[in-house]
Amino acid sequence: MVGDDVREVLIKIVIFAGLSYLGLSLLAYFVQHRLTYFPDTSRIVPEAAGLRGVAEWVVETPDRERLVLWRADAKPGQPTILYFHGNAAGLANRAPRVAFFQSQGWGAVIMAYRGYAGSSGSPS
């Protein structure tokens, strides 16, 4: 009958949609690291990014990874900003922000996450 044919087609559509959803969910789970982090691995010194009076430091972590950070001193009586750059780009892309902090007399410490801007390791 026609009703049975429609029912059979609807069941196949629901099964296909469910399996497609499951497959896409599994794919997203297994590649989520690549969908979340977009590390810019290039290491640029502050001067090459147009910054003056900014020192580059390399800090070794207890698990022997190296983290690159930039440090600009504050003028007397002014605050120092601890700035984390987010999950895209690297330190050089934040140079205008550091320059703004300096123009206000503020200090800045900006660290490259693992896997970004010359820091070793990988983000997690």
Where are these regions (language model features)?
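N-terminal Lys/Arg-rich, disordered targeting/topogenic segments
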Residues: 1-7
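Compositionally biased, intrinsically disordered low-complexity regions
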Residues: 5, 52-55, 109, 123
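An N-terminal hydrophobic leader/cap segment in hydrolases
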Residues: 13-60
